[in-house]
Amino acid sequence: VMEFIDAAKLLQKRFIGKVKFILAGDCDKENLAGLGEEKLRSLLVDDYIEWIGYQAQMFPIYTDSDIVVLPSYREGLPKSLIEACAVGRPIVTTDVPGCRECVKSGYNGYLVPAKDSRALADAIGLLIEDDAKRKEFGRNSRLLAEEEFSIDKVVRQTFDIYQSIIRIS
């Protein structure tokens, strides 16, 4: 979360009044290293960085967004990035396992080093400024979702795993 807010603030002079950074999700009260709600609210910037909290339905958020950003230190396979691909959004995320499975840097988004707000800001800025690249990456995200995350492919891969286990036994 901090890298997202820091990146937005690094871009503030160039883009305030032109874009809005929207942060969705609850504060993790169990995570002692996480941001508390009060601290998070103190970091927001009116009409520029907004926190909308937990959203039961993310589809409207994705469809209203031009870019999806997920700075993470570690992930499984992020559902949020699969959903972003499915709705055809370009993605900026960190170069960590899980996120790498959803983003091919330079194809449907950018992978940046974890904990690097400057690199995150640079990648977001590139996509804000380049409408054609944003649209191209969005189309490519949708193609990636259809190719890699379709139910047919997932079922086929699961079946293949079971087949290989049966052969080994």
Regions found by a protein language model. Give the residues of each.
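A conserved mid-protein helix/loop that constitutes part of the nucleotide-sugar donor-binding site
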Residues: 1-10, 118-119
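Nucleotide-activated donor-binding/catalytic signature segment of Leloir-type glycosyltransferases, i.e.
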Residues: 25, 34-53
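Aromatic "clamp/platform" in nucleotide-sugar-dependent glycosyltransferases that forms part
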Residues: 54, 73
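A short alpha->beta transition loop at the rim of the catalytic pocket in nucleotide-sugar-dependent
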Residues: 59, 66, 88
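Short hydrophobic beta-strand element within catalytic cores of glycosyltransferases
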Residues: 90-93, 103
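Conserved acidic donor-binding segment of nucleotide-sugar-dependent glycosyltransferases
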Residues: 105-106, 110-117, 126-131
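A short, well-ordered alpha-helix in the C-terminal region of glycosyltransferases
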Residues: 119, 126, 133-148, 154-160
